[in-house]
Regions:
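Short aromatic/hydrophobic "clamp" motif used to bind/position activated sugar donors
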Residues: 83
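Short, flexible, basic/aromatic active-site loop/helix in glycosyltransferases
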Residues: 115-121, 130-159
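Conserved donor nucleotide-binding strand/loop of the catalytic core
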Residues: 36, 50-77
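A conserved acidic beta->alpha catalytic loop
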Residues: 26, 42-50, 90
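Conserved donor NDP-sugar-binding/catalytic core segment of glycosyltransferases
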Residues: 95-128
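N-proximal low-complexity "stem/linker" segments adjacent to membrane-targeting elements
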Residues: 1-26
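Short, acidic, metal-binding catalytic loop of nucleotide-sugar glycosyltransferases
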Residues: 25-35
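A short, conserved alpha-helix in the catalytic core of glycosyltransferases
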Residues: 161, 165-168, 172-176, 184-206
């Protein structure tokens, strides 16, 4: 796009050759009249991730791997006032960026948000109820329980962003100092980041962090 991007989509990767193409195609095919850019922050993959990603996005090779470091490293190289962080196995629908941008334009007090998550790669499970046969995935209850978890976190005024999709205003991201560098393999980057945002909003006496139940993304259930 010729005009300066208003949205920067940032995807950290490390050996994601089996997932990255689908995710980037989903971002590339957005029906969005807002200028946006696609940035891949690669942590020195040893597979074909970078080769694939360069067909769809601007790729930066970071000096070391680690999701927090990779994301923080590329943010200064982006232009958008709205930062969209996606995992390499997360899929968005074709109107995702348009809808997200409108939400932030309408709600000036919104600091950051995540869309609801649905896990897409579970195995089908069939069961019979009376004469009817029903089929669900083995992630059905995981999807439901995760939805309840984030709903009640928000209800109790301790909202938690979802790591596979975090959308935040650039200025707010910079105010909290980006993602905290946690020890390797320690789960909880998104919770620590959410807590930093909650602290900032209370200190500033303004700002909201939300999970959007009316917008969803698909992501892998791998852990």
């Amino acid at each position: 796009m010729n005009s300066k991007p208003k949205i920067s989509v940032i995807i950290p990767t490390y050996n994601e050759e089996t997932n990255i193409k689908k995710s980037l195609i989903a971002v590339k095919k957005q029906r969005c009249n807002i200028p946006y850019e696609i940035i891949v922050a690669d942590g020195q993959s040893s597979d074909e991730t970078v080769t694939i990603a360069r067909k769809f996005a601007k790729v930066y090779i970071t000096p070391k791997k680690g999701k927090s470091f990779q994301v923080n490293y590329v943010v200064p190289k982006t232009s958008g006032d709205l930062l969209v962080f996606l995992d390499a196995d997360t899929l968005i629908d074709e109107f995702f960026l348009q809808k997200i941008y409108r939400i932030f334009e309408k709600h000036k007090n919104l600091f950051a948000c995540s869309a609801r998550v649905k896990y897409y790669d579970g195995k089908a499970i069939s069961f019979k109820l009376g004469s009817q046969v029903f089929s669900i995935t083995n992630y059905f209850f995981l999807n439901f329980s995760m939805h309840l978890y984030y709903f009640f976190k928000t209800l109790l005024r301790y909202p938690e962003l979802i790591g596979c999709n975090i959308i935040i205003r650039r200025g707010i991201f910079l105010k909290v100092g980006g993602f905290k560098q946690l020890p390797p393999n320690l789960i909880g980057m998104d919770k620590v980041f959410s807590d930093s945002l909650i602290y900032l909003s209370r200190k500033m006496k303004k700002g909201k962090i939300r999970t959007l139940n009316f917008i969803s993304v698909l992501t892998s259930g791998r852990f």
